[in-house]
Amino acid sequence: MKRVLIPGVILCGADVAQAVDDKNMYMHFFEEMTVYAPVPVPVNGNTHYTSESIERLPTGNGNISDLLRTNPAVRMDSTQSTSLNQGDIRPEKISIHGASPYQNAYLIDGISATNNLNPANESDASSATNISGMSQGYYLDVSLLDNVTLYDSFVPVEFGRFNGGVIDAKIKRFNADDSKVKLGYRTTRSDWLTSHIDENNKSAFNQGSSGSTYYSPDFKKNFYTLSFNQELADNFGVTAGLSRRQSDITRADYVSNDGIVAGRAQYKNVIDTALSKFTWFASDRFTHDLTLKYTGSSRDYNTSTFPQSDREMGNKSYGLAWDMDTQLAWAKLRTTVGWDHISDYTRHDHDIWYTELSCTYGDITGRCTRGGLGHISQAVDNYTFKTRLDWQKFAVGNVSHQPYFGAEYIYSDAWTERHNQSESYVINAAGKKTNHTIYHKGKGRLGIDNYTLYMADRISWRNVSLMPGVRYDYDNYLSNHNISPRFMTEWDIFANQTSMITAGYNRYYGGNILDMGLRDIRNSWTESVSGNKTLTRYQDLKTPYNDELAMGLQQKIGKNVIARANYVYREAHDQISKSSRTDSATKTTITEYNNDGKTKTHSFSLSFELAEPLHIRQVDINPQIVFSYIKSKGNLSLNNGYEESNTGDNQVVYNGNLVSYDSVPVADFNNPLKISLNMDFTHQPSGLVWANTLAWQEARKARIILGKTNAQYISEYSDYKQYVDEKLDSSLTWDTRLSWTPQFLQQQNLTISADILNVLDSKTAVDTTNTGVATYASGRTFWLDVSMKF
């Protein structure tokens, strides 16, 4: 795979012209360098995935998370996608350089697509007050995208409201030279994979659930895509892409207390995507883009031990944006106006949730909980205006300057709604209601103004380039004035691109979590017959931020090998967590959010790849080796994020020792050392491409919370929370993808691809419990992919 490497950016193949035009707006760079490598890796904190890269990589469910899985700056939650739940198609959470997954910024064509409603809560459990969400506002199908850029360090000043990284997805723009129509079909099913299940989990796995944890013993995935590219008039055209990704999962309909299964039912998991962009090249000076976007996801669930608990949970996002580029005599002006609607919802089939000592479901009788909690939703409408002015380069003596300035205003209209009244209670032995709570119908909203100003300058002298910048953010949600310094320097040591050093310091302020305010609104609709109340306090919070020190090295070895090393050190400050207390006098439970969370992360990566592929007969061979290491310590669960309630603990017992809590290694996303060998073989005459990734992951540790019944529990430390780590073995996996584009079908351009993930069928434990029950990664998995271009 051909890529053009530029300090600060990676470009690829036919996309170079447009990508270079976009990237010129962000960062100074030296002369281009062309390399060949199977998998994009960071160059000075930027990784650029073109449509060619996306087609090469086995992208699983087709989400952005799947695309970024192999990036050395990224770590996945290894417990989220396992042998137990391969039928799920939702995007997985990602952590970038040790930051919480909910603190990443997602953009579509430069406009925020981040869901900041309740991104740390991905629970599928029934709840009357808490709505599931995730940080990706749009569940994009990457096969419909033109390119995706990950900014993991040295992030330019125009990007903000994140602690981890920025993921900017670009929708395809009209190109008269592209194919008119592309059709695609992709599939897998439970019969095509090997599941590794602990003996203690087999019964629950075969039933399809355990309480509110959902498994996929029997599923079929079918993905359909359609995209087209059409010229409508001179210098005016449109692109559009449609996709449906569907997983049909068969689970137990109801399981009694003694394990009797009463029927099975099929539950759908669906993600729809629709993207379109109209482009008008009005003149040499003016270009207009009108973008329309939509994704909708829905998931059907029931709690198998609760009759009549069926519910639908999902997300719907849609929006439009108008972008105008104006080339002035002395500068380039870009103006963007956009609107995005992002919503999450839970819709139960029933409005009453109750427990009774004696109930009947089919032929089964006994104590049970049944019903549902009505329909509840929350949403935000973001109205965006942003502009940026890039001055043309000018010189002062021997020093050249290229400053740019920008401003952004976003009005966020956030609201939450309970669409009908619901109730929950327990029927006691006397047949009377106890623990009775009424959730009243209601709707409430928050209006938030977000302001941003930024400026930076590209300063070059001989073979040294500097980029100082500063960003200012303010919003009236937390009412904090945040100033983010950004600085990067590049040094081309011999002025010939063979040896380059990049270094910098940057600060990144995070985004707001709207659910803290919306939850307080929902709590006001809750009436407890006993008089209990709930309050949420968040108004005095500081904005969480990360300080970053980073360095990158790039060295050409001989005539054909490129080596790159990157080091990133992050300190996370003022991370949000919570504490709860009860005022017995007023019967009020008060949840107070605080800034007690903190982490420190060391991240290092090293890669070797070729400037030119190896040619053996008619086969091009592209090898690549990537090492990455990420280690974090802190007092915050990355998964729980702002819902973490342990950060107030100054000391804990860890592996038998009383230690400071913030010195304990972070437990989740804990995959420190990874080494991968990527190898592509391309035979142009036959149209065959064979892509391979052999990945080794060092032994890692699973965190276990000890109870008094555990043998490792130390009674003299009973006043402290106690944790112990259990070692999980190292793993070796081999993923392969074979694609064939028959050269004798030039008009149709048919491509048939087969993915085999975990070819070796390695049995890798990813988690364990305090009773020794292990959870394993997925075994060998087959995917089939067919596409045709006209």
From Swiss-Prot:
Residues 178-790 form the TBDR beta-barrel domain. The lineage of its organism: Bacteria, Pseudomonadati, Pseudomonadota, Gammaproteobacteria, Enterobacterales. It is a multi-pass membrane protein. One of its GO terms (cellular component) is cell outer membrane. It comes from Escherichia coli (strain K12). This is Uncharacterized protein YddB. Pfam families: Plug (PF07715). Keywords: Cell outer membrane, Membrane, Transmembrane, Transmembrane beta strand, Transport. Residues 37-172 form the TBDR plug domain. Belongs to the TonB-dependent receptor family.
